[in-house]
């Protein structure tokens, strides 16, 4: 019976990750197609996606209140949802890698961006925004940053990103993170 519970927990976790991936991909696709949509279509689609994130967040809250064995594994997903809703991170890809706790892929993405900047495929402003997001995500995942990365982060971190990092560190417990994410969803709907 214990092994069946582990299997079910694993399957539930997989399903939740797939749902989060789908929502993050939806946000990413929306940003990529922003120019092709009129303002109303864009805002409506974004609002619907945020509502879906809110519903997903509510589901996570119910799961966490009933099954404490999932708390640690779901905390990363909650922080990712919080970041998406509060728009601390603007890049859905970074949110997805953060939620899946994949620092190696975040570092690979950072190296690709460095290359793209050097060959002129990426504008400096976008590079700076994304690098700050990735470095913040790496720090939140407990990764050691180089002195240069720390300096870059200090010089370029936005107030929103700094607030996300501060709040996510201070809150710690799942209920408080969920409460904040729920508040951010309500604020985004208005």
From Swiss-Prot:
The lineage of its organism: Eukaryota, Metazoa, Chordata, Craniata, Vertebrata. The gene is Lzic. Belongs to the CTNNBIP1 family. GO terms for biological process: response to ionizing radiation. This is Protein LZIC. It holds the Pfam family ICAT. Keywords: Coiled coil. Residues 2-63 form a coiled coil. Does not interact with CTNNB1. The keyword Coiled coil applies. Gene3D superfamilies: Beta-catenin-interacting ICAT. GO terms for molecular function: beta-catenin binding.
